[in-house]
Amino acid sequence: MMLMAIYHLHCKVFSRSKGQTAIAAAAYRSGTKLEDHELDTVSDYTKKKGIAFSEIALPSNAPKEYADREVLWNAVQEVEKSKNAQLCREFEIALPKELSLVEQIELVRTFAKSLVSEGMIADYSIHDKNDGNPHVHILTTMRGIDDKGKWMSKQKKIYSLDEGGNRIPIIDKKTGQQKISNGRRQWKRETLLDTSWNSKEQLLAWRKRWSDICNEAIDKKNALIEEENLAVNLYAQQEAISHIDHRSYAEQGVNKTPTIHEGWQARKMERLGMTSERLEQNRRINQMNSVWSQLDTLSKKYRKYNEDHYQDYQKEVKSVKQKSIKTYKKRQT
């Protein structure tokens, strides 16, 4: 038996077109009070509970004052001026509750540093209300920082190519020849938005990276658990933690239905004695997954036998289904 670590990584982008601000987003996630210099407003979330840890990671070439959250996100809003500008990206990630806060911080720092190595700034806050749902919010800038500590452009220029994949020369209308400037031949170029950080491929790479980094932390924790278990009796031993997997069940070849994200509001409803449809849906999904798991086990068990055992197989399958129906009906009463 192993403790099941949960994989959840969700990305979204905050933008002006949605009426959002980077200052408000950062203040809420860090549980701080920040002044918005552009709107002349204050976002105060100092009474927000459950902020376990908060920190900003900067590239080595970034201005040191960006370690101040208010300075950083006001600078972002100053450079992202267009009415539909993307202000920041948020990673919302579930943390293994089996890890201590110190271990969770080390895990998040490792992932944040990997993002910073790509040029962005990362502002992250760990939330934990002791409700079994520790998670981290990581806000990252949409632009990188250049060698001079300035914001990089979101655009890039590339050479225009003809159908054969060759660069297209700029022709001087007077001479009919290719233009030359400062001894260099001139070629047609076009400006493109640099959307590499917004690509589906990049998101998949980040999802896998988190899975890999998290599993390394889990392996480290399991090694400690194994060492501690050697020093205690059987009844005091701890369970190891399972790996997480960024792939869907279908991609893993697993016959399971994925659960939906519950969120703190759903769990709060149940603590107050109300019914949460999201939690009920996950219970139904988990029940069906349990049935499929049992049926898969039976299938593997009887696969090596001949047809004489088919009736035994059918009886066990029927038993599993009947137990499942009884459990479901019991929950409805």
Specify the residue positions occupied by each region the protein language model found.
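N-terminal nicking endonuclease/strand-transfer module with a His-rich metal-binding environment
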Residues: M1-T333
